Amino acid sequence: YQKQLDDIPQARIIVVSKQDMRLRVYDFKGTKLMDYGIACGRNMGQKHKIGDLKTPEGMFFVQTIEDASDRTHDFGDGRGEIQGAYGPYFIRLDTPGSKGIGIHGTHDPLSIGTRATEGCIRLNNNDLAELVSIVKPGMMVLVTPSFQDYEQEQRYIGNRRDSVTNQ
């Protein structure tokens, strides 16, 4: 019976808290199976457009689990392409309105616990390897905001409302 549940992506859920800077995995009974520190988007608030450096909030699903060991990334800091920027894996999420958002490893373990990414959810590489062992396409990922994200979103909505009424 447990083996059958292990094969169902919906039998587990990943919950990412931008408030606690934690990624937790729960089973269908609500038992916490894993708990890791993360880094998330540099900017506060809900993701509204590509390049805003925000981690999207809401319910998403794992699309693919990809080998990222040979991938590089240019962080725009003058150092050029960084080998291993994504760690060993990239767990691609289905995030409508955004592309390239996922859960991945890091070349910079000291960034965990900070707002350091361009929107992705970053883990230590050992934690990511453990997480990948149970992740399956179709698995649900819930990303929840921090209080600061919520306040930033309220300002964003207020500014948009004001700009529409002042036209």
Describe each PLM feature range.
Residues 127-167:
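N-terminal targeting pre-sequences for secretion and organelle import
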Residues 37, 64, 122, 142-143:
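Structural signal for conserved beta-strand scaffold positions within catalytic alpha/beta enzyme cores
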